[in-house]
């Protein structure tokens, strides 16, 4: 399992130290919020540029914004590995995905918990990652929504049919209690914020998620 600690849960007063504490992660997950699509504001390109100078871990950028193409053009020069946009609020998602891809970045598509998985069927050939929100977007520290496990299975079947190389990622409430179920549901990458950053040994917490084991009965 690949693991992406969410910087939304980090202490920004000590960001360099926080990033070093999760340096064994596969990605760093960056939530960009504009205060319109979701009721919260987070980091912009200046902070993200600083992050790239602090770490060699690939960046996984999640745009929770309106007018995603504007933000893609802001963040693409920083060379994140992934930029994901929401399917729900884009009039022309294929156009934005192509913009991301033309920048040499893996495009991703995001679904909120209650958005039907069939809505992305015709976009799957244009993406390298599908991100399923397992909480309502906007704030960290929320409880995992179990209904997303069934959705993972359905999306994985769509991926197998339309784009087998596409990764499946889940974001929200991920911890050591549900990681095995997520792996069984076909998830390739998990985003975890509060669980990792509230752990005494963050590197060990990441390793525990990476090396998934069936929980004892």
From Swiss-Prot:
UniProt keyword Isomerase, yes or no: yes
This protein's UniProt keywords: Carbohydrate metabolism, Isomerase, Metal-binding
Biological processes per GO annotation: pentose catabolic process; pentose-phosphate shunt
Amino acids binding substrate: 6, 62, 138-141, 171-173, 193-194
Molecular functions (GO terms): D-ribulose-phosphate 3-epimerase activity; metal ion binding
Catalytic reactions on record: D-ribulose 5-phosphate = D-xylulose 5-phosphate
Cofactors that this protein relies on: a divalent metal cation
Record: residues binding a divalent metal cation: 29, 31, 62, 171
Family: Belongs to the ribulose-phosphate 3-epimerase family.
Protein name (Swiss-Prot/TrEMBL): Ribulose-phosphate 3-epimerase
Gene name, Swiss-Prot/TrEMBL: rpe
